[in-house]
Amino acid sequence: MSVAVLAFGLNHTSAPVSVRERVSMPVDLVKPALAGLRSAFGGAVREAAILSTCNRTEVYCAADAAVAEQLPIWLADHHCMEAGSLHPHLYRLHQNDAVRHAFRVASGLDSMVLGEPQILGQMKDAVRAAEEAGSLGTLLHQLFQRTFAVAKEVRSQTEIGAHSVSMAAAAVRLAERVFGDLGQARTLFIGAGEMIELCATHFAAQHPRSMVVANRTAERAESLAGRFSAGTMKLADLTERLAEFDVVVSCTASSLPILGLGMVERATRQRRHRPMVMIDLAVPRDIEPEVGRLDDVYLYSVDDLGRLVQSGTDARRAAVVQAEAIIETRVQGFMHWMQSREVVPVIRGLHQAAEDVQAAELERARRLLARGESPEAVLEQLAHGLTQKYLHGPLAALNRSAGDERKQLLAWMPRLFPGRDSRR
């Protein structure tokens, strides 16, 4: 059975954050998941890679096409979910659609922030994890190498990333909606990853009254805080100190909420009900969604920011058209490469069969020469034997065929076995 490129998963357009957080995979769980996927399907899934970010969880496979319908069931089972609850949010892509999707994702065309560059790095991390897990083979390796090349081509030849509103900039805008000038705002960042670093950069440009970084690893918190003359604190101190802050931006890799309803409710009472902006960029979420019901708290999720960053998309519509044209050309190129791979075993088989005939006829000729036969007679017998073997296959196929099959064979014969007329 031929191997197909398959992709399935969900993203910010097909599933809300409440669903995405249930299938999100931290980096340390990706390799075990890949091992479980290949084990569940045996040889039917030859290669696999998993891309899991705040906005998407996707699985790319080189697999037998017959298992395509069972793959989403595995994803649901892996996360202890009912397949029916996940099914409405999933997309399943096959062959050129899967290839096109990979190219679009890496190029930023499928991102919440159109043209954002972070997704390319995240996809490279996913490929690295698959390589380390031993689940990347020739087909997916070629797919992702071409994916990265396409993303570079799109970004260098179009303005897909120009004039975009980043998630970090959107976070600042949301805080400004509540407080106006942020010059007097005390800002807390929970986490110390790339997204928090971007947010800290944008907030620092507004010169807030103070900035503090809280992170599980003190060394990383101090490193980030040092760039912005910010303070640091332990996550364990959140309960006591949360009330100090007007703006809280959180993005960690925690599998459970860090800020619960009770903790935030106590903080609002200590603040005497002064407003608090809380921006949760994590998937799974760092802040319990029930916090948004509190009168004095303005809670925004990653999806809320996504709606804000859609502004400016119209201005980049021409760049999108250019990018899609580049991608379509490269999709066709990859599919041609895949089709050429399917021919390779046939060509090898033909060469091997021809070499076997050649070896047998040469051995027969040597025996005849050893017995004293004249070289001229041996050469004639060698030529005759090769001719008979050459013609045996096609003539036997013609003799066995009938009707439409015979018509097709007759039509192909001049191309497969060009005669004197075809060389004129």
From Swiss-Prot:
Substrate binds at residues 53-56, 111, 116-118, 122. Disulfide bonds: none annotated. It catalyses: (S)-4-amino-5-oxopentanoate + tRNA(Glu) + NADP(+) = L-glutamyl-tRNA(Glu) + NADPH + H(+). NADP(+) binds at residues 191-196. Keywords: NADP, Oxidoreductase, Porphyrin biosynthesis. Its EC number is 1.2.1.70. The active site is at 54 (nucleophile). Catalyzes the NADPH-dependent reduction of glutamyl-tRNA(Glu) to glutamate 1-semialdehyde (GSA). Belongs to the glutamyl-tRNA reductase family. PANTHER family: GLUTAMYL-TRNA REDUCTASE. During catalysis, the active site Cys acts as a nucleophile attacking the alpha-carbonyl group of tRNA-bound glutamate with the formation of a thioester intermediate between enzyme and glutamate, and the concomitant release of tRNA(Glu). The thioester intermediate is finally reduced by direct hydride transfer from NADPH, to form the product GSA. This is Glutamyl-tRNA reductase. It comes from Bordetella avium (strain 197N). The lineage of its organism: Bacteria, Pseudomonadati, Pseudomonadota, Betaproteobacteria, Burkholderiales.
